[in-house]
A protein has these predicted regions:
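A generic "structured core" feature
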Residues: 86, 155, 159-161, 165
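C-terminal segments of enzyme domains that contribute to small-molecule binding surfaces
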Residues: 4-19, 25, 110-111, 118-148, ...
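N-terminal segments that cap or nucleate solenoid repeat domains
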Residues: 35-57
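Short, charged, low-hydrophobicity "junction" segments
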Residues: 18-39, 59-63, 78-80
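Flexible, glycine/small-residue-enriched loop-and-beta-strand segment within the central core
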Residues: 53-148
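Short, recurrent motifs enriched in small/polar residues
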Residues: 39-46, 73-74, 78-79, 133-135, ...
C-alpha cells in the first residue's frame, strides 16, 4: 500500500463529507505524529479551536509542555488559537513569564533566588513588561521552529514561515518571515481579504464546510456570493 493511501482520516463511522471528529486526538490512522490539539490540551489558560493540529515526530501529546513556554497560571495570560490551524514541529509560543524587568541597569532576576535578594524589589518594574494574551486567528499556518513572542496577535489566514521570530502583530492573510518577522507578501488583494473575513468560513456548520471544500481550497472569490457567505 502506498504511503498516500495509508494516511487515511480516521472518521470512525462519520458520514462522507462530514469530516473527522474534532474530538479525536489522533485523526489520521497510522500517523500518530499528527494530533488535534483541542482534545489533547487541558492546561489552564490555553484555548484551542476545533481541527487545529500539531505535527511532531515525538507525538503531539506534549504540546503544552514542549511548545508553550514560561506560561505560569499566576500571571493569567492566555494562549488562544483558533480553528483549522496547522502548527509544525518545533513551533514555540513564548509567554509573559519569560519577561524580565528592563527599566534598570541589569535585567538579571535577582529577586527570584531569594536569600535577601528579593528585598527592595519593585514588582511594578516586571509587571509593566506584561504584553497580554497571545492570540492566533483561524486558518493560520505556523511553520517549523517558528517562535511567537508574548502578546502577539496573528490574524486569520496568515502564514508564519519556518524559523521566524514573530515580535509584532501579523495582519490577516499576510505571510511573514525572518527575525524579527516582517510581512513579505499578502496572500490576496485587499478586496479578497475583506470578503474572506466577512465569510469567516471556519465558523460555518461542519456540513456546510464539507459541501464547499472546493471553494475553500480554491482561489476564486467571485464564487463567494450570498447566501454562500452566510454561516447558516
Amino acid at each position: 500500500m502506498s504511503p498516500a493511501r495509508r494516511l487515511v482520516p480516521a472518521n470512525y463511522g462519520l458520514i462522507p463529507m462530514s469530516g473527522p471528529n474534532p474530538n479525536i486526538k489522533h485523526p489520521i490512522a497510522m500517523h500518530p505524529r499528527v494530533g488535534f490539539l483541542k482534545p489533547l490540551v487541558s492546561a489552564p489558560n490555553i484555548e484551542i479551536g476545533d481541527f487545529t493540529y500539531y505535527d511532531d515526530p515525538d507525538g503531539p501529546d506534549k504540546f503544552a509542555e514542549k511548545c508553550v513556554l514560561h506560561h505560569y497560571p499566576f500571571i493569567g495570560d492566555r494562549l488562544v488559537i483558533g480553528k483549522f490551524c496547522a502548527i509544525a514541529e518545533g513551533a514555540r509560543f513564548i509567554m509573559n513569564g519569560a519577561n524580565h524587568a528592563m527599566s534598570g541597569f541589569s535585567t538579571y532576576p535577582f529577586n527570584i533566588f531569594g536569600h535577601g535578594w528579593e528585598e527592595g524589589f519593585d514588582p511594578e518594574t516586571w509587571s509593566k513588561e506584561i504584553r497580554g494574551d497571545t492570540i492566533v486567528g483561524n486558518d493560520v499556518w505556523i511553520g517549523m521552529d517558528a517562535v511567537i513572542m508574548p502578546g502577539v496577535q496573528i490574524g486569520h489566514g496568515a502564514i508564519v514561515a519556518a524559523k521566524s521570530v514573530v515580535t509584532h502583530d501579523v495582519p490577516p492573510y499576510a505571510i511573514v518571515a525572518g527575525n524579527a518577522a516582517k510581512v513579505v507578501k499578502m496572500r490576496f488583494d485587499e478586496f479578497t481579504v475583506r470578503r474572506l473575513l466577512k465569510a469567516a468560513w471556519w465558523d460555518w456548520p461542519i456540513d456546510k464546510i464539507g459541501r464547499n471544500l472546493n471553494a475553500i481550497r480554491g482561489a476564486d472569490i467571485s464564487s463567494w456570493r450570498p447566501p454562500f457567505e452566510r454561516a447558516g
